[in-house]
From Swiss-Prot:
HAMAP family: RimP. Belongs to the RimP family. This is Ribosome maturation factor RimP. It comes from Alkaliphilus metalliredigens (strain QYMF). The lineage of its organism: Bacteria, Bacillati, Bacillota, Clostridia, Peptostreptococcales. Required for maturation of 30S ribosomal subunits. The gene is rimP. InterPro entries: Ribosome_maturation_RimP (IPR003728), RimP_C (IPR028998), RimP_C_sf (IPR036847), RimP_N (IPR028989), RimP_N_sf (IPR035956). The keyword Cytoplasm applies. The keyword rRNA-binding does not apply.
Length: 152
Protein backbone atom coordinates (compact mmCIF):
# COMPACT_ATOMS: atom_id res chain seq x y z
CA UNK A 1 0.00 0.00 0.00
CA UNK A 2 1.45 3.35 -0.98
CA UNK A 3 1.36 6.52 1.15
CA UNK A 4 -1.78 7.98 -0.47
CA UNK A 5 -3.64 4.68 -0.10
CA UNK A 6 -2.57 4.48 3.55
CA UNK A 7 -3.72 8.04 4.31
CA UNK A 8 -7.00 7.37 2.49
CA UNK A 9 -7.52 4.23 4.57
CA UNK A 10 -7.09 6.26 7.77
CA UNK A 11 -9.56 8.88 6.53
CA UNK A 12 -12.21 6.48 5.24
CA UNK A 13 -12.21 3.83 7.98
CA UNK A 14 -14.43 5.83 10.40
CA UNK A 15 -16.89 6.61 7.56
CA UNK A 16 -17.13 2.97 6.47
CA UNK A 17 -17.39 1.65 10.03
CA UNK A 18 -20.13 4.17 10.92
CA UNK A 19 -22.21 2.79 8.04
CA UNK A 20 -21.29 -0.82 8.96
CA UNK A 21 -19.71 -1.38 5.55
CA UNK A 22 -16.55 -3.33 4.79
CA UNK A 23 -13.55 -1.57 3.27
CA UNK A 24 -12.38 -4.06 0.64
CA UNK A 25 -9.57 -2.24 -1.14
CA UNK A 26 -8.04 1.13 -2.03
CA UNK A 27 -6.08 1.88 -5.21
CA UNK A 28 -4.33 5.02 -6.38
CA UNK A 29 -3.41 4.50 -10.03
CA UNK A 30 -2.43 6.39 -13.13
CA UNK A 31 -4.32 5.33 -16.24
CA UNK A 32 -3.40 7.21 -19.36
CA UNK A 33 -3.13 10.91 -18.53
CA UNK A 34 -5.42 10.65 -15.47
CA UNK A 35 -5.01 9.51 -11.86
CA UNK A 36 -7.72 7.64 -9.99
CA UNK A 37 -8.31 7.05 -6.30
CA UNK A 38 -10.57 4.00 -6.17
CA UNK A 39 -12.22 2.80 -3.00
CA UNK A 40 -14.07 -0.53 -2.93
CA UNK A 41 -16.69 -1.14 -0.24
CA UNK A 42 -19.11 -3.96 0.50
CA UNK A 43 -21.80 -5.10 2.92
CA UNK A 44 -23.95 -8.20 3.30
CA UNK A 45 -26.50 -8.14 0.51
CA UNK A 46 -24.33 -5.85 -1.60
CA UNK A 47 -23.59 -2.16 -1.89
CA UNK A 48 -26.07 0.24 -3.51
CA UNK A 49 -25.42 3.37 -5.52
CA UNK A 50 -26.69 5.43 -2.56
CA UNK A 51 -24.15 3.69 -0.30
CA UNK A 52 -21.33 4.58 -2.70
CA UNK A 53 -22.53 8.18 -2.92
CA UNK A 54 -22.69 8.53 0.87
CA UNK A 55 -19.14 7.21 1.32
CA UNK A 56 -17.84 9.25 -1.63
CA UNK A 57 -19.25 12.50 -0.22
CA UNK A 58 -17.85 11.80 3.26
CA UNK A 59 -14.43 10.82 1.94
CA UNK A 60 -14.30 13.73 -0.50
CA UNK A 61 -14.84 16.17 2.36
CA UNK A 62 -12.09 14.55 4.45
CA UNK A 63 -9.69 14.47 1.49
CA UNK A 64 -10.32 18.17 0.85
CA UNK A 65 -9.52 18.94 4.50
CA UNK A 66 -6.40 16.75 4.75
CA UNK A 67 -5.30 17.47 1.15
CA UNK A 68 -2.89 14.48 0.86
CA UNK A 69 -2.97 14.37 -2.95
CA UNK A 70 -1.23 17.24 -4.72
CA UNK A 71 -2.18 16.43 -8.31
CA UNK A 72 -5.63 16.26 -9.89
CA UNK A 73 -7.41 12.91 -9.61
CA UNK A 74 -10.80 11.27 -9.91
CA UNK A 75 -12.39 9.71 -6.81
CA UNK A 76 -14.39 6.53 -7.46
CA UNK A 77 -16.26 4.55 -4.79
CA UNK A 78 -17.80 1.26 -5.87
CA UNK A 79 -18.48 -2.36 -5.00
CA UNK A 80 -15.57 -4.76 -5.46
CA UNK A 81 -17.39 -6.60 -8.25
CA UNK A 82 -17.78 -10.31 -8.89
CA UNK A 83 -14.02 -10.82 -9.23
CA UNK A 84 -13.15 -9.02 -6.00
CA UNK A 85 -9.55 -9.18 -4.81
CA UNK A 86 -8.61 -11.20 -1.73
CA UNK A 87 -5.92 -9.40 0.24
CA UNK A 88 -6.59 -9.62 3.96
CA UNK A 89 -6.68 -12.72 6.14
CA UNK A 90 -10.38 -12.12 6.76
CA UNK A 91 -10.99 -12.32 2.97
CA UNK A 92 -9.46 -15.80 2.85
CA UNK A 93 -11.65 -16.92 5.75
CA UNK A 94 -14.80 -15.38 4.29
CA UNK A 95 -14.39 -16.97 0.86
CA UNK A 96 -13.14 -20.42 1.90
CA UNK A 97 -14.66 -22.99 -0.46
CA UNK A 98 -15.10 -20.50 -3.32
CA UNK A 99 -13.34 -20.69 -6.68
CA UNK A 100 -10.39 -18.30 -6.87
CA UNK A 101 -7.77 -17.30 -9.39
CA UNK A 102 -4.11 -16.68 -8.59
CA UNK A 103 -2.02 -14.58 -10.97
CA UNK A 104 1.65 -15.25 -10.34
CA UNK A 105 4.62 -12.92 -10.75
CA UNK A 106 6.53 -15.67 -12.55
CA UNK A 107 5.29 -18.75 -14.39
CA UNK A 108 5.51 -22.09 -12.61
CA UNK A 109 5.48 -25.13 -14.92
CA UNK A 110 4.60 -22.76 -17.76
CA UNK A 111 1.57 -21.29 -15.96
CA UNK A 112 1.14 -17.75 -14.63
CA UNK A 113 -2.50 -18.33 -13.62
CA UNK A 114 -3.84 -21.02 -11.30
CA UNK A 115 -7.52 -21.56 -10.57
CA UNK A 116 -9.04 -23.71 -7.87
CA UNK A 117 -11.16 -23.92 -4.74
CA UNK A 118 -9.85 -21.87 -1.82
CA UNK A 119 -8.91 -24.17 1.05
CA UNK A 120 -7.41 -21.43 3.20
CA UNK A 121 -4.45 -19.31 4.12
CA UNK A 122 -1.90 -21.28 6.14
CA UNK A 123 1.48 -19.91 7.24
CA UNK A 124 1.25 -17.12 4.63
CA UNK A 125 0.62 -19.67 1.87
CA UNK A 126 -2.57 -19.70 -0.19
CA UNK A 127 -3.88 -23.26 -0.33
CA UNK A 128 -6.14 -24.16 -3.24
CA UNK A 129 -7.66 -27.43 -4.41
CA UNK A 130 -7.05 -27.75 -8.15
CA UNK A 131 -8.53 -31.25 -8.56
CA UNK A 132 -10.28 -33.87 -6.45
CA UNK A 133 -6.92 -35.22 -5.30
CA UNK A 134 -4.49 -32.30 -5.61
CA UNK A 135 -3.93 -29.22 -3.49
CA UNK A 136 -1.39 -26.48 -4.18
CA UNK A 137 0.27 -24.28 -1.54
CA UNK A 138 1.44 -21.00 -3.03
CA UNK A 139 3.51 -18.54 -0.96
CA UNK A 140 1.81 -15.12 -1.03
CA UNK A 141 5.01 -13.37 -2.12
CA UNK A 142 4.83 -15.29 -5.44
CA UNK A 143 1.24 -14.15 -6.08
CA UNK A 144 0.61 -10.81 -7.80
CA UNK A 145 -3.19 -10.96 -7.56
CA UNK A 146 -5.65 -13.23 -5.77
CA UNK A 147 -9.27 -12.76 -6.75
CA UNK A 148 -12.58 -14.58 -6.87
CA UNK A 149 -13.03 -16.47 -10.12
CA UNK A 150 -16.08 -15.55 -12.17
CA UNK A 151 -18.25 -18.60 -12.85
CA UNK A 152 -20.37 -18.72 -16.00
Amino acid sequence: MNKIESITEDLITPIVEAEQFELVDIEFKKEGPHKYLRVYIDKPGGITLDDCQKVSEGLSKKLDEADPIVENYFLEVSSPGLDRPLKREVDFLKFKGEMIELKLYEAIDGQKTIEGELVGLIDDKIVIKISETEEVEMPREKVAITKLAIKF
